[in-house]
Amino acid sequence: MAFQGTSRTLTQQSSAATSDELQKILFSPDAIKKMATECDLGRHHWMRADNAISVRPLVPEVTHGSIASFFKSGYDAGELRSKGYMSVPQVLCAVTRTVSTDAEGSLRIYLADLGDKELSPIDGQCVSLHNHDLPALVSFQPTYDCPMETIGNRKRCFAVVIERHGYIGYTGTTASVCSNWQARFSSKNNNYTHIAAGKTLVLPFNRLAEQTKPSAVARLLKSQLNNIESSQYVLSKAKINQNARSESEELNVESPSFAIGSSSASRSEAFRPQVVNGL
């Protein structure tokens, strides 16, 4: 039978002072800066030839040490039940290419545990993306909470690993990866349902159709068509008659008569206003 009870959060388990201390560790200006610079949280990471394999921990080393010390002191004092766990419900990566679609290359993205020397994908959650498949959204869901421990000189936590393959002749940036996640820390841990890594291919953005109104290109085409029409028909002393029963204005134009079957008559009858899609 599955457990159906309730569990207390870290804030409920600790005093307000220790809770504020943890908040300061996680959300201080220095901690936020390190999350950006060391982990690339919410930032675009460029995949280059000189950076073919990228390993980005989800927690900076300094922040990891501060959190581990916080939990250890609470554990040694008998205030907390464990030395702390890191929980990440989901990691979402937005991947876009920065080269043409005919470039031969691919990316291999997966979530790893820094406690594993081999850096193997967690539960086989690994996604391969060919260059012509991009853009795409990739998601990972760890099936366990990671202990906040140190193994040798390694700070154990989850990490996003990105491998670049191929792209012969392209030494610069071939793809951009923007990763987002929300790390949680608690004195309790759990196991979670295994979910395969998600891969959603996204249609490239059609910036010419982003507006509901006629675009600048459509307006230009319309103006060109109007210029063509005005160049073919020259109004000579047109008399404007206003009808009181109608809101429109009628133009009475005296145009020269054409012989039936002549080339001029055929051109006149064959001409029809052209319609541009979206106008």
Curated annotation (Swiss-Prot):
Can you list the GO cellular component terms from the UniProt entry?
host cell plasmodesma
State its location(s): Host cell junction, Host plasmodesma
According to its UniProt record, where is this protein mainly located?
host cell
**Protein name (Swiss-Prot/TrEMBL):** Movement protein
Species name: Cucumber mosaic virus (strain C7-2)
Question: What task does this protein carry out?
Answer: Transports viral genome to neighboring plant cells directly through plasmosdesmata, without any budding. The movement protein allows efficient cell to cell propagation, by bypassing the host cell wall barrier. Acts by forming a tubular structure at the host plasmodesmata, enlarging it enough to allow free passage of virion capsids.
Note the InterPro entries from the entry.
MPV
Give the record's keywords alphabetically. Host cell junction, Transport, Viral movement protein
Q: Could you give a single Gene Ontology term from the biological process aspect?
A: transport of virus in host, cell to cell
- Which family is this protein grouped under? Belongs to the cucumovirus movement protein family.
